[in-house]
């Protein structure tokens, strides 16, 4: 694969055989963020679990102390007083059947997170095949199915992110922007890793954190020593 000049320059700063300390890796991720925009710093964590088994799933949500640096657009499925509560709490879109039709008929995805009250899940369930593959389906474990819509919205706007395994047993999460600086990125990193370690399934055997890699949006991967995280 052809890599651009900036990527190649950034790669020279990285020792690909070394397992870095978390703080050092985050500093390097910021140095290798050479794009003209404020790159996102991402963490990719491979776990020693088998996601094919129901008792080895790892999924949840955590509020990063310094947020992600991204403005998050929230869609809420609610009615009556709960719809009013959602509007007052700062939801970007609030509705019911009319929004479901809009998504189905117009392929509309101008939002980042979907929240629903439990009584709306019967109709929201019709969107499973549309929202599911995009990771947008409301889920109680992520706190996006809730009667307390005001808290759900506040948490999301404050920097709550969802983490879950992909098919290769890897979790991919943003932990902020390159402009955050090392202290804020380390706070967010520790918070995310702490939540994932706490969520370790009882059925998981052997080493839980197989690998931890940090990268900027356009930069190379930097390996972190997983034994320095747990």
Curated annotation (Swiss-Prot):
GO MF annotation: an example: tRNA binding
Alphabetic keyword roster: Repressor, Ribonucleoprotein, Ribosomal protein, RNA-binding, rRNA-binding, Translation regulation, tRNA-binding
Lineage: superkingdom: Bacteria
GO biological-process terms attached to the record: regulation of translation; translation
Pfam families in UniProt: Ribosomal_L1
Disulfide pattern: none
One annotated Gene Ontology cellular component of this protein: large ribosomal subunit
Cross-referenced NCBIfam families: rplA_bact
Role this protein plays: Binds directly to 23S rRNA. The L1 stalk is quite mobile in the ribosome, and is involved in E site tRNA release.
Subunit comment: Part of the 50S ribosomal subunit.
Family classification: Belongs to the universal ribosomal protein uL1 family.
Protein name, as recorded: Large ribosomal subunit protein uL1
Organism: Ruminiclostridium cellulolyticum (strain ATCC 35319 / DSM 5812 / JCM 6584 / H10)
Gene this protein is translated from: rplA
């Amino acid at each position: 694969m052809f890599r651009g000049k900036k990527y190649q320059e950034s790669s020279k700063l990285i020792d690909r055989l070394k397992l870095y300390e978390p703080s050092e890796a985050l500093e390097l991720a910021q140095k290798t963020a050479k794009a003209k925009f404020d790159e996102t710093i991402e963490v990719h964590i491979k776990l020693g679990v088998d996601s094919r088994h129901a008792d080895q799933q790892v999924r949840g949500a955590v509020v990063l102390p310094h947020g992600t640096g991204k403005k998050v657009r929230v869609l809420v499925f609610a009615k009556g007083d709960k719809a009013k509560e959602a509007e007052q709490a700062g939801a970007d879109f609030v509705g019911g059947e009319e929004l479901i039709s809009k998504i189905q008929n117009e392929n509309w995805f101008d939002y980042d997170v979907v929240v629903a009250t439990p009584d709306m899940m019967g109709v929201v369930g019709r969107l499973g095949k549309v929202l599911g593959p995009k990771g947008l389906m409301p889920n109680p474990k992520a706190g996006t199915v809730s009667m307390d819509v005001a808290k759900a919205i506040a948490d999301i706007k404050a920097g709550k992110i969802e983490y879950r395994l992909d098919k290769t047993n890897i979790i991919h999460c943003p932990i902020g922007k390159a402009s955050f600086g090392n202290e804020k990125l380390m706070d967010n990193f520790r918070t995310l890793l702490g939540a994932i370690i706490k969520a370790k399934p009882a059925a998981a055997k052997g080493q839980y954190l197989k690998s931890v890699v940090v990268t900027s949006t356009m930069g190379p991967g930097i390996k972190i020593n997983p034994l320095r995280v747990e």
